[in-house]
Amino acid sequence: MASRFLTEEWAGEVSSILNSHPGFKSSIANADLGIVYNVTGTPSGDVAYFLRTAGGNADLGLGTLDNPDVTVGSSYETAAAISKGELNTQTAFMTGKLKVGGNLAKLMMHQAVINQWANAVKDMEVEY
């Protein structure tokens, strides 16, 4: 059964998938990273969710973090296209569809985390 994008159910399923995916687990082995994503214009209004990695574990949930390393903002359309694999994050950033703030050097240092996240969830059934 598909999880609805950007809901608690979706966040829980993504978190579970990430923590059981060997490639993702390898990418976060030494990553202490906090990212907050702000998505505007969703069917439920604006939604914030976060990814926190520390100690070889990942936590993804709805809401925000105190003092995230990086903040990412996008429209629902862009977030859904990235989630569906129709748009990669680098292209979205380069075309201005993703607004990124905070410690960009740290984000680039841990680019494998983002790449492995996409790889881990590529077959997840999601309802948009």
Residue ranges, per PLM feature:
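Feature captures hydrophobic
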Residues: 1-128
